[in-house]
Amino acid sequence: MSTNSIKLLAGNSHPGLAELISQRLGVPLSKVGVYQYSNKETSVTIGESIRDEDVYIIQTGYGEHEINDFLMELLILIHACKTASVRRITAVIPNFPYARQDKKDKSRAPITAKLIANLLETAGCDHVITMDLHASQIQGFFHIPVDNLYGEPSVLNYIRTKTDFNNAILVSPDAGGAKRVASLADKLDMNFALIHKERQKANEVSRMLLVGDVAGKSCLLIDDMADTCGTLVKACDTLMDHGAKEVIAIVTHGIFSGSAREKLINSRLSRIVCTNTVPVDLDLDIVDQVDISPTIAEAIRRLHNGESVSYLFTHAPV
């Protein structure tokens, strides 16, 4: 059992999630001021002593225009804690920024996810907690421990309680998500189908091919994130054109950037379900949210007490 106390700090990216984690742990959020000067430089002040404490900084990767500002907030907060002589700094990043830039997929392309890992370590981070990394190998970019939590247990609970899964089929919108969907199918004893998509450029899918029979069935379309929603909407159209009864999209990270709102309004999706790893303010009837703050809070508690977090890979806290 650790003798130093938990200190929770939060940037401006997701105050709602930070408050839920605080309530779950019974630990108040520490006083933090994050401001921008007129020239847009970020300034941070920590309003209480954190010397020799176990500090957790909650800041998610989010925002069409603010994502880089939020990243700078996180780095400056980490550095401020480091210079304040804390015992350990854990960055809690539910949605890891730049996670899709994880490999050199064309000439002269940067591996930006590796750069983010370097920046976090250089700032003084000792540990990272995140959820459903777009590419799990990003953990290997770090020289510090990374706990990549899974949204799967919470998704399983939602499917079991909020859908007629006995008369449904799971669908992966691309080959990369097949492993994720196969894991859910095994646990739910369900069949699954696969959509192969061909991209000509980023965020734009040109053609989709369905592998599997979805005629007359409810389709649960599973993915790790919904950004512009082009993939999900085209996948939904493909499924409906092949005779699907309805399509429910279930994702971990509901980014919903660009024209996502308009696409969802005009789509044939019956429902889109996401967690609250990032703020969602679409105000659409078809959008439903799953709260993952209990999982993150329990991971913080276990890490602070020196307990294993592997239980959370297969179970959602009650």
Swiss-Prot record:
Pathway recorded for this protein: Metabolic intermediate biosynthesis; 5-phospho-alpha-D-ribose 1-diphosphate biosynthesis; 5-phospho-alpha-D-ribose 1-diphosphate from D-ribose 5-phosphate (route I): step 1/1
Binding site for Mg(2+): D132, H134, H143, D147
Enzyme class, spelled out: transferase
Keywords of the record: ATP-binding, Cytoplasm, Kinase, Magnesium, Metal-binding, Nucleotide biosynthesis, Nucleotide-binding, Transferase
InterPro entries per UniProt: PRib_PP_synth_CS (IPR000842), Pribosyltran_N (IPR029099), PRibTrfase_dom (IPR000836), PRTase-like (IPR029057), Rib-P_diPkinase (IPR005946)
Reaction catalysis annotation: D-ribose 5-phosphate + ATP = 5-phospho-alpha-D-ribose 1-diphosphate + AMP + H(+)
EC assignment: 2.7.6.1
Pfam families in UniProt: Pribosyl_synth (PF14572), Pribosyltran_N (PF13793)
UniProt subcellular location: Cytoplasm
GO MF entries: ATP binding; kinase activity; magnesium ion binding; ribose phosphate diphosphokinase activity
PROSITE patterns: PRPP_SYNTHASE
Record has Iron-sulfur as a keyword: no
Chief localization: cytoplasm
Protein task: 5-phosphoribose 1-diphosphate synthase involved in nucleotide, histidine, and tryptophan biosynthesis. Active in heteromultimeric complexes with other 5-phosphoribose 1-diphosphate synthases (PRS2, PRS3, PRS4 and PRS5).
General remark: Present with 8120 molecules/cell in log phase SD medium.
Record's protein name: Ribose-phosphate pyrophosphokinase 2
Lineage of producing organism: Eukaryota, Fungi, Dikarya, Ascomycota, Saccharomycotina
Gene that encodes the chain: PRS2
